[in-house]
Amino acid sequence: MEKDPSVADPLQPLCLSDSSNHVTYASSLLTLEELKILEGVLHQNKDVFAWTHSDMPKIHPPVGSHRLNVIPSSRPIRQKVRRFHPDRQKIIQSEVDKLLTSGFIRKEEYLNWMVNVVVVPKNGEKWRVCVDYTNLNDVFPKDSFSLPRIDEIVDSTVRHEILSFIDAFFGYHQIPMFQPDEEKTAFETLHGLYYYKVMPFGFKNVGATYQRLMTKIFKHIIG
């Protein structure tokens, strides 16, 4: 069971299956009737919760995918290979193994496009492995799809007693890459070349792609 999330209300755990890992939390301030209703809704829809990567159904490509829309006159980007300390190499390979196991990336022998990974500090002694798409972002036109205005969202909550939020499990990785653009996401490590089959973090327009898909999916309940 994960540590209780940090929120204002005191919390009580709700188990959605026989597994001790399938736990969410509800406010301890709910009445018994409210808690019973909430439990019923959660159990009725427990199939929409993802606890591991294998629980993620992913978006069907015809519904949405991430296109890079590279400027036609652009030449393939190939960054100079970076070298890392052996300790960092182990961290990188561990992350690559996780991505391979999850089906997010695929190994390839040769690709025209290639960038490097970077290892940055995260929460003290931990490290985060990222792909450096800085150069690639220069050859993509900006996607100007409008993001929601925070002030309008706040105004729309007036006089509503209950608010609903969605926390998508590895949300970007649930969106597939447009297949002809997959090789342009390639990155190199000590053990080879890999490319993303799903939308990675770090690209300039991923936020717009994600918001466009959310607007499409929830169109019937927005507004």
Give residue ranges: language-model regions:
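Retroelement reverse transcriptase polymerase core
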Residues: 6, 13-223
